[in-house]
């Protein structure tokens, strides 16, 4: 199956990003559909990575397209910083209340696999123990977060209890201004061929503590 040129560029860009020996060809953008290129980059969330590789390898692209990439990269820098600061404040509050909290998915990949905020910022995925939902909801509401319109008018304690006992639903979105949090209390769904122990997040924390002590 023939791959579209725009998709091929995306793949080559990622290869170049993760392995500097795979340099992009100088004429890699010849004959492409720039509108389609922008759509592909937006869908796959690698605009900052493409900009970084273009600058590093001094490849010419249309000025208006370059300007849009630069503008978006600046927005990303602000979004990353804002998310990091918000996450630190949330972690501090949860620690004071003895609630185990684990960031995962996007924000974890961002910190461990990418450099200089090159992964596009988005929501903050957080994982807690199911039993801590009532306290977690209270903390988020006190920080100014709101639920979706359908849930906002419900009794919070009752909502937490319903979710604790629910089957098949393991996350809930919360919003505050530019911040969007997906709060999870499990990471495996009933239709999957595997599951995790009820308190597996505590096991993760214990393992992290063990590793920290072994390196101290």
Regions inferred by a protein language model and the residue ranges of each:
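Conserved NTP-donor binding/palm subdomain of two-metal-ion nucleotidyltransferases/polymerases, i.e.
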Residues: 1-122, 128-216
């Amino acid at each position: 199956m023939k791959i579209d040129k725009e998709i091929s560029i995306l793949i080559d860009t990622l290869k170049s990003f993760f392995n500097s020996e795979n340099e992009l060809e100088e004429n890699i953008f010849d004959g492409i559909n720039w509108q389609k290129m922008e759509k592909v980059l937006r869908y796959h969330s690698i605009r900052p990575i493409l900009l970084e590789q273009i600058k590093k390898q001094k490849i010419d692209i249309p000025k208006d397209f370059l300007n849009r990439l630069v503008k978006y990269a600046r927005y990303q820098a602000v979004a990353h910083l804002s998310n990091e600061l918000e996450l630190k404040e949330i972690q501090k509050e949860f620690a004071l209340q003895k609630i185990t909290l684990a960031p995962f998915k996007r924000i974890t990949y961002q910190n461990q696999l990418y450099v200089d905020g090159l992964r596009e910022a988005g929501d903050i995925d957080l994982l807690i123990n199911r039993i801590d939902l009532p306290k977690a909801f209270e903390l988020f509401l006190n920080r100014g977060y709101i639920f979706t319109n359908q849930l906002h008018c419900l009794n919070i304690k009752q909502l937490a209890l319903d979710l604790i006992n629910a089957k098949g639903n393991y996350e809930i979105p919360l919003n505050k201004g530019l911040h969007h949090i997906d709060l999870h209390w499990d990471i495996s769904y009933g239709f999957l061929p595997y599951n995790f122990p009820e308190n597996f997040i505590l096991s993760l924390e214990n393992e992290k503590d063990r590793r920290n002590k072994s390196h101290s």
